[in-house]
């Protein structure tokens, strides 16, 4: 799973004995409509409604992920190990609001941890360094958007997290023929 403020990318991978994988299912949860601003104070009824609506929908997304885990009989759920502190990101007021105030990352992570302990699958937190870059380079194409490509890379890392020498994938020039730049 690739967690972003506006989108959650999900991919379900199946690995064989040779550590090769195929993508069984991929999905994007679009949360951008939930992140609108009310242009009112945080104590206003509309602002409280939007905040509660956002939290409810994020919890529903977690339940949908859990349904997919049960349907595909997954044994591991791989997420990014994020520890982002609130700060000025120097990309504008709207971006800072989205990353620091609106994004309920811990709500999603804690709910997924709770569901994994109830339903018995392993939750693996992986280092997200360059997951978007590597994911787009190796798996990105017109049918696989950015958040799906990085979720594939996060899943690949999570599958072999404790194996030595498996963090970065093997790169070949054939991966570049799908790229548009």
Q: Where on the chain are the PLM-derived regions?
A:
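Positively charged, helix-rich recognition surfaces that bind polyanionic ligands
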Residues: 1-181
């Amino acid at each position: 799973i690739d967690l972003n403020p506006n989108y959650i990318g999900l991919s379900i991978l199946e690995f064989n004995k040779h550590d090769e994988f195929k993508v069984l299912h991929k999905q994007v949860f679009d949360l951008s409509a939930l992140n609108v601003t009310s242009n009112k104070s945080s104590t206003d009824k509309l602002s409280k409604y939007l905040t509660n609506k956002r939290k409810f929908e994020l919890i529903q997304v977690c339940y949908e992920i859990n349904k997919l885990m049960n349907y595909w009989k997954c044994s591991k759920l791989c997420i990014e190990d994020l520890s982002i502190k609130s700060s000025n990101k120097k990309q504008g007021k709207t971006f800072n609001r989205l990353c620091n105030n609106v994004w309920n990352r811990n709500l999603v992570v804690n709910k997924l941890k709770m569901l994994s302990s109830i339903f018995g699958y392993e939750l693996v937190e992986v280092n997200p360094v360059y997951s978007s870059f590597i994911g787009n380079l190796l798996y990105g194409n017109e049918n696989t958007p950015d958040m799906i490509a990085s979720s594939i890379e996060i899943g690949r890392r999570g599958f072999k997290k404790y194996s030595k020498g498996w963090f970065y994938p093997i790169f070949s020039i054939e991966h570049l023929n799908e790229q548009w730049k």
